[in-house]
């Protein structure tokens, strides 16, 4: 049986005069066609070709490029803002009122490129007053935008009269200093601003050269800047005598007295700067202490305006975001590590970026090694690590290469890592204010977060003091279908965690790093 010949496509240019059902092939052309072309007329012998109708996709593209096409929708959250459009968008958008705060147009545009278009309460309150030249005490909970509240007016006043070292920012930790340094660099990108970072853990010589080069803004930890003032020579630090603006970020920690106080170093730094009557002083903190308030009562020159004080108060005394869920988990003293392992492994927490806070560096070191052996993606941040390793570990956590950061209170202040959705207090902090700063690493800028505190029999009074400080009681931790005690028994986690802990302790005793490599005890002589 002969199979039927498949039908060939027929040109759309059809004439009624053509013969009924029979179609003849066209006469041979000088250019041999790759495929047999059919024609409806026997006398159609030329090589003319009728193009097929455009494909729908092509026609849609054509319509987009047509002159009468509608203009593209303005860039939203899903569309990146181009630098050339940022200024126009920032000044035009009603939702953004930075322009209404008398912020310079170039700064409005720079903030818009960073997706910062609407000022927060602390920014609305402080920016206009700082631009007027007033000293300022700004109190607002963590994650409320205090860095922008002092950076924007500082950069605007510097741009009006750029010279030498215009501003100094003091902050208690190296990681927070690095974060402020990077944020100021980003905001000042349209201008030729020269910030410099002065922190411990790195060589002093390049820092001394940078200070002698008269940078525009110095971001420093008090201890290292005090070392330069004492030992680097007059030529290095003489530029500090013309500073116009000084910022104490996390001022409660900088001005606190007692063991480990930074106050002597802060006083050394301030002694190298102009007197308070000749400079502008800004204090920002999440917890306004009596030492911070004391700035308001300092003697002032007659021509200087009074200190501006603002405490942005919301519910829960303005310390804990309403989007933060606070819980506690009762744990026996001998099985705290096993409870932590199971808590991090539940269905609800297994994928959450988390920070685990400890009271001691040795505890943080041990937990990192133990959790690594239990197949958690973990890194650490504490003072036993060299500065280069601290920076690298923090970068890994920011980039989600590690899901868990085990840290001491060195990471509790100021660090802004928006992805963090879980904070675990492995050790209950002794000071309720430290608890406020720890849990402030999550639920930032309106996002949701959870804080879980592991509570033993000896920690009850500490928890009660924390609840009184924040004005809210903790709830007992629970997850649907999950029993921590049941999983410990059923899965054999107690034995697994015990073995991992013993291996970690042996590794520490042998002087190995977290990857099991033998540490080189020879130190470089500087």
Curated annotation (Swiss-Prot):
Main localization of the protein described in the UniProt heading: nucleus
Motif annotated as Q motif, chain positions: 96-124
Cross-referenced InterPro entries: DEAD/DEAH_box_helicase_dom, DEAD_box_RNA_helicase, Helicase_ATP-bd, Helicase_C-like, P-loop_NTPase, RNA-helicase_DEAD-box_CS, RNA_helicase_DEAD_Q_motif
Gene Ontology terms describing biological process: rRNA processing
Location in the cell: Nucleus, Nucleolus
Transmembrane segments: none
Keyword annotations of the record: ATP-binding, Helicase, Hydrolase, Nucleotide-binding, Nucleus, Ribosome biogenesis, RNA-binding, rRNA processing
GO molecular function: ATP binding; ATP hydrolysis activity; RNA binding; RNA helicase activity
Biased composition (Polar residues): 17-31
Statement: the UniProt record of this protein carries the keyword Cell cycle: no
Reactions catalysed according to its record: ATP + H2O = ADP + phosphate + H(+)
Sequence motif DEAD box, residues: 249-252
Top-level EC class: hydrolase
Domain Helicase ATP-binding: 127-306
Residues reported in the UniProt entry to bind ATP: 140-147
Region (Disordered): 1-77
Span of domain Helicase C-terminal: 338-485
GO CC annotation: nucleolus; nucleus
Domain description: The Q motif is unique to and characteristic of the DEAD box family of RNA helicases and controls ATP binding and hydrolysis.
UniProt similarity note: Belongs to the DEAD box helicase family. DDX49/DBP8 subfamily.
Function: ATP-binding RNA helicase involved in 40S ribosomal subunit biogenesis and is required for the normal formation of 18S rRNAs through pre-rRNA processing at A0, A1 and A2 sites. Required for vegetative growth.
Protein name in UniProt: ATP-dependent RNA helicase dbp8
Organism: Aspergillus fumigatus (strain ATCC MYA-4609 / CBS 101355 / FGSC A1100 / Af293) (Neosartorya fumigata)
